[in-house]
Amino acid sequence: MTHLPDLNRSIDEVVALHGGDATRLVQILLDLQERHGWLAPPLVTALARRLGLSRARVEGVAAFYSFLYLEPVGQYRVLFSDNITDRMQGSEALLAYLSEKLWVEKGKVSEDGLLSIDTTSCTGLCDQGPGLLVNGWAIPRIDRERLDQIAQLILERQPMAQWPDELFRIEDNIRRQDTLLAHNLRPGQAIRAALTRGESPEGDRPVSERSWREGIPAAPGPAATLEEIKRSNLRGRGGAGFSTGLKWEACRDAPGDTHYVVCNADEGEPGTFKDRVLLTRHADLVFEGMTVCAYILGGGRTKTHGFLYLRGEYRHLLDPLNECLARRRRDGLLGKDICGRPGFDFDIEIHLGAGAYVCGEESALIESLEGKRGIPRNRPPYPVTHGYLGQPTVVNNVETFCAAALIAKEGGDWYRAQGTAKSTGTKLLSVSGDCERPGIYEYPFGVTVRQVLDDCGARRTQAVQVSGPSGTLIDASEFDRRIAFEDLPTAGAFMVFDETRDMFDVVRNFVHFFAHESCGFCTPCRVGTAMMKGVIDKIHAGRGAQHDVEEICRLQKVMYLAAHCGLGHTACNPMRDVMQRFRPAIQRRLKSLDFEPAFDLDGALAVARQMTGRDDAKAHL
């Protein structure tokens, strides 16, 4: 550990980089961990003192996030993705191979402190798995040959900056393009269209320019652009499907000193990776949509500011995204007087997540932005009136902002010409699992599941998980259902399982995921997900009985009715669906008894009997 004077100097430097702002605590902790490897007790104590926070507050925040470490970890931290699609591609065997090769047990640190190996939730590389993270950097397409190469680099203590670029090459795998992915919008076009919409010239000067310089009431540009968003019937692409136009209107009308625009790029739902591709290929479009939103909210009269909350697994995108922002500032598309419009000031900063699935929920994300544990807030009030720092805040998904930018340029009628009446436009699907061509597929809303399966080369499919573990698991009899808010809504995940897969193993992976990702705030979710995990593990171990199935049904009802947020409400979906559609996968594992103990008492006491030398009937007393 660094000596105290050097530690204090390091803390001062990092805190200064963040303006001494305690709301940036998560970012400060990430930066300090980057320097020191882990967050040792002296560091936590000194940082708390420097920020004027309690030690318990700082340690509590650090303990909440999976990618912040309060105990020593290896100089090289290798995390294998534990998502079901990675398991289907052999991730468990590959983890065991690397552990044996380097003599490091899963979940442990090597004796010399060089290496630690463990698992993590989905890394967003489902179309090119198995995936893993090394010190936060994503590496796709893992096989034994690649692991041999990684092992050698680690043993040679090669700095990761010197590792071969080929290891980190991530493909976009865009298989089908439609309106969004095939757009030819140039940077600034959507903003300029919004600025001029609804304005009428007087001489050589537009009304908007006269209004700013002569005190004339503002031109209808913001209101007219908002009307186009509303006319398009664009709905949030994060899964909930709330009207984007109504959300922006409510935020615009809410009183506040500053209105905030937040892009939720924390796509932690297992099986989802569309936002990774959008941020890689179409970052300008994302930032364009955020800027249009800021124009609607502020109209150049109210102060606005933007955040992009980037999931920690996408750390490799941080530098390219910051470069894109810098270019847009140079081109007058961010900063002061955007596109030459006096008073239209807006900028965007990127906050990096630290490994918490629950931060995909908008109020939990805002808590994280404020430097807190990512625990969802009670609602109402909603973020549109009381969001970041208590100010009006719009939180939308990456794909939503992209669509909004296109609407600002082309208009609402153009957009709603695609899709269905209740689900306008197109949807990006992250297709993975048992298919020949995994990747990104863009379709107009209303496409059937069967059409997607045909296009991706799926054969002998028995099930599709739509929208990840929190979504809906359907069987072959439902493949004519449609991807749409009125039928099968989705945040984007589309996981394919053929007839060789045991659906019990699939749902068990999902149950373990929810038990790990519960924020722990409310008892129904914290205890309920743990109990669900215990029951399904009991069935997996061959000790399940009909009583356990009934227990699952009771847990589902309690969690759905009493959990604090959406995670607890949807954590039961996998078990609900597998019992409805694939019940034999559970029934064949059950014993004929109505009840079976959760563990073998005699087996558990075997060691005690051996130590005491007793083998009589009362040996357990």
Name the predicted role of every residue range.
Residues 1-621:
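Feature of Fe-S/electron-transfer and energy-metabolism proteins
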